[in-house]
Structures are given as C-alpha cells and as structure tokens.
C-alpha cells in the first residue's frame, strides 16, 4: 500500500516511523510519503489560509494550494487514482469496518486540514471520504490521520505476526473484546479465570464469547441493535442484563441507601 499525507506540519507525522507502522515500511508492505502543503503556494509568505466568506471566527484553507498539491500527487502513479481521505469532525464515524475497507485500497491520500477546515470546493472536487474519529474537535487532521493509518496498517497482509490477533480484535465481529490476562496466575489476590488455564479450547472460546457479549452490552449496547443472535448468546445477554439491573438494590438496613455491586464482568466465570 502507498499512503500520501498532505499537511502544513510534516513533523507531526514522525510517529509513523515507529512501532507497527514503521516496521510495515521497513518490510516494504507500506510506503508513506509526507508532503508540505506550503510547497504548492505561490506567494512569498507561503499563505495557505484566508478569511471565511460570510464572516465568522478563524480562517479557512484556500483551494489553490490543495488543488495544485493533489493534482501533482495523484499524477505520480500512472493509470491509477488514489482514494482521497479528509479527516474532519463533520465526517462519517470511523469504524473497524471502514478500516477494513480502506485496507483493501492500494493507494490512499490523506488531506490534513487546519483552522476552520478546507474550502468546501476542494472537498467536493477531490475527496472520496470524509472521516471522523470521534465526536470532538482537534486542531487539525494529523492526529486523526495517525489513528486511521495505524488501524489500516495492522490489517495489511503480513503486518501482524499472528493473524488471529486481527480476528480476535474488538469490533472484528461487531463486539467489544473481553478482558485478557497473562502471568502470574494470581496477582494481588485476584486469580486468572480457571477456564483460561484449563486447556479446554471449546470452553475458553465460550468464555471469551460470553465476556465479549457482556462487555458490549454494558459499554456499547448500540452495537447489539438490529442483530440476530444464537440461542446461547441470547441466554448470556439476558443473564448479563438481569445482573446489570440488580447492581443497585435497596440496602438491607434502615434508610434509603443503595448497595452498589461491582461490574457484571467478572474474572471468575467458567
């Protein structure tokens, strides 16, 4: 995969040399090219922004540098057009499914906006995707590009040493991943669930599925909407819902206090 990133702060993308994304580049799986948008300005001040039409605070990124940059970058590979991604809080929410879709592309171009954003005419002309990484506002698109590109890179063939890691990820099957444990078997008085040390792979798979369902119900119930579940899953969800409803019970002593029970996700389920 090739990824081109256009920004006015190229140094912001230095972390892409590290860890998994850096190794993907070393192994030739991923090629990243970072471009300074100011290289396509035409005035002595290398201006990339101007006041917004209609008034209002802040500045808007001018269309001319963006058009010149994207025209030149997209012409560098003959007979191929990249998928152009603009990170923006006004975009479509980024999900694991979106990462999987982008990972199938041979060439991505990321446009990192700043200030109040990029002139809408650039978006209409060039963008294939406007993507939001959450319901909050950042100073620019660079941090979002780091997030998106790492999520995509780990899905590329051969990047992860164990392909099962991808299959077990949160969201890989639409559920959050359950709790994970390693050595020692007992730490600060808390024992690793015995089922995980039993060697019974079917029981372990059932436990992990149960924990994923429970965690998703508690933390992201929206992910369970409009889905069909097997009978075994429905039993787990019903039990988890009942336990969650019982977390706050009237205190057995006089008064109106409540007993708060711990989260229904428990390490001891077998």
Swiss-Prot record:
Asked if the record carries the keyword Metal-binding, the reply is: no
Membrane-spanning intervals of the chain: none
Record's Gene Ontology CC terms? cytosol
UniProt-annotated binding residues for S-adenosyl-L-methionine: 113, 133-138
Region annotated Disordered sits at: 251-270
Q: What PANTHER family is this protein classified in?
A: TRNA (GUANINE-N(1)-)-METHYLTRANSFERASE (PTHR46417:SF1)
Q: This chain belongs to which protein, by name?
A: tRNA (guanine-N(1)-)-methyltransferase
Q: Which organism is this protein's natural source?
A: Frankia casuarinae (strain DSM 45818 / CECT 9043 / HFP020203 / CcI3)
């Amino acid at each position: 995969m090739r990824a081109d990133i256009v920004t006015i702060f190229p140094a912001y993308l230095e972390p892409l040399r590290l860890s998994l994304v850096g190794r993907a580049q070393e192994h030739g799986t991923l090629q990243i090219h970072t471009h300074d948008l100011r290289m396509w300005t035409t005035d002595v001040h290398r201006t990339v922004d101007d006041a917004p039409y209609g008034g209002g605070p802040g500045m808007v990124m001018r269309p001319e540098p963006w058009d010149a940059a994207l025209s030149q970058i997209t012409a560098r590979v003959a007979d191929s057009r990249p998928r152009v991604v603009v990170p923006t809080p006004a975009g479509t929410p980024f999900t694991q499914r979106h990462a999987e879709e982008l990972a199938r592309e041979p060439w991505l171009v990321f446009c990192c906006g700043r200030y109040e954003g990029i002139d809408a005419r650039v978006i209409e002309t060039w963008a294939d995707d406007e993507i939001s990484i959450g319901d909050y506002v950042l100073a620019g698109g660079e941090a979002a590009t780091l997030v998106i590109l790492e999520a995509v890179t780990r899905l590329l063939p051969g990047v992860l040493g164990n392909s099962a890691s991808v299959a077990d990820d949160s969201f890989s099957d639409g559920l959050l991943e359950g709790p994970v444990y390693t050595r020692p078997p007992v730490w600060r008085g808390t024992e690793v669930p015995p089922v995980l040390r039993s060697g019974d792979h079917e029981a372990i798979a059932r436990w992990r599925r149960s924990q994923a369902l429970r965690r998703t119900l508690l933390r992201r119930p929206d992910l369970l909407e409009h889905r069909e579940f097997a009978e075994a899953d429905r039993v787990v969800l019903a039990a988890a819902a009942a336990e969650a409803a019982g977390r706050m019970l009237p205190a057995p002593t006089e008064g109106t206090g409540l007993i708060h029970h711990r989260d229904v996700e428990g390490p001891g389920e077998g």
